[in-house]
Amino acid sequence: DKGDYGPYRQSSRADIYHIYAKKLVLDGRAYPVFSTDEQLDAIKAADKKTELKNTDWEKEAEARHEAMLKRREFTIEQVEKELAAGHAFALFAIADGDPSKRIKVTDLIRGDLEIPECDEDVVLLKSDGIPTYHFAHAVDDHLMRTTHVIRGEEWLPSLATHLMLFRYLGFKAPKYMHIAQLMKLCEDGSKKKLSKRDMGANMDDYKRLGYAPECVIEYVMTLLNSNYEEWHAQNPDKAYTDFPFNIKKMSNSGCLFDMEKLGDVSRNVISKFTADEVYNGLLEWADEFDADFASRLKAAPDRAKAVISIGRGGKKPRKDYGTWLELRDYMALFYDETFRIIDALPDNFNKNDIIKTLDAFAASYDH
């Protein structure tokens, strides 16, 4: 592991987590629960199912609170007996919050917020000794000198828990930015969160389809800051790195991920590339995804660049392809191995007339 704050693999940091876990136990801030991870997951799953069916939220919260208090009821003798028997345990943090009280916190995107104090015990270490995100976040981000945490808004409900853990450990909490979720447009016109299984959520999708990194970055910039498009229109020759990015310009509501707009942005970006830049990007993509096409490009690079140069440059450069995949299909016309007649001539055409017509066209075509 390179860097000043390694090791970076969670499995290699077990001793570090356990040291801080012992501190919390000694401080009376944590306690063991002798249940397997499967049993804990079953409890969580049952809670979720109950929440979906039960509309009496107050009663449900009371039941969970009573179950939590019951978990805290144990003696040292009981713990020693469980340990002597070799039983595994999960380690819980004891929440000291009052849900009727509020914590004032500043989110760098959302401004000043008031959130309920944490009143639910949370798992710090699972029964295999591996920390949960809650605990690893506090320990790792402190030891690695993290000053700003940027994460999705789905973590806002956990913010009180994390602030509590930083306080328990005696650490200074970082500054937080909770960004809005990416949304996708459904067929019925509604919007929902972009899932990791949706097209566009995985960077491998962009590589496979042949989007140039510059195009994806350009599009993402339009999502990050509301004034980027206006700035870019006024500064068409400047790089995105020159843009005065402003956290306060980030949206609080979910922005819509639009593949069609990505295509428009990509076509515009590629239209400004030189033939050499297009060739290099196309070849890099073909080397990974289409070996035969890559071989044709390498065999005659000047010919490939000549094809790429068609309609490139000038005041109105061509904008009919936005990915290397689309460009490959376009270039198929110029290679014998991939040339295909899409619309064959009707059978009733006289062959001699066809030959005469083609000869006349070839003679008049100024290429």
Which residues make up each language-model segment?
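Active-site cores that bind ATP or allylic diphosphates and position pyrophosphate for catalysis
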Residues: 10, 23-26, 30-193, 202, ...
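Aromatic/His-enriched, Gly/Pro-containing loop or helix-boundary segments
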Residues: 1-20
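Catalytic adenosine-cofactor/nucleotide-binding cores of aminoacyl-tRNA synthetases and other
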Residues: 169-365
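Non-transmembrane alpha-helical segments in soluble domains
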Residues: 18-25, 217-220
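Short, charged/polar micro-motifs that form catalytic or ligand-binding hotspots
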Residues: 7-10, 152, 206, 252
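Hydrophobic (often cysteine-bearing) scaffold residues that line and stabilize catalytic clefts
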Residues: 13, 17, 158, 212
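Short glycine-enriched loop/turn motifs at secondary-structure junctions
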Residues: 2-4, 144, 200
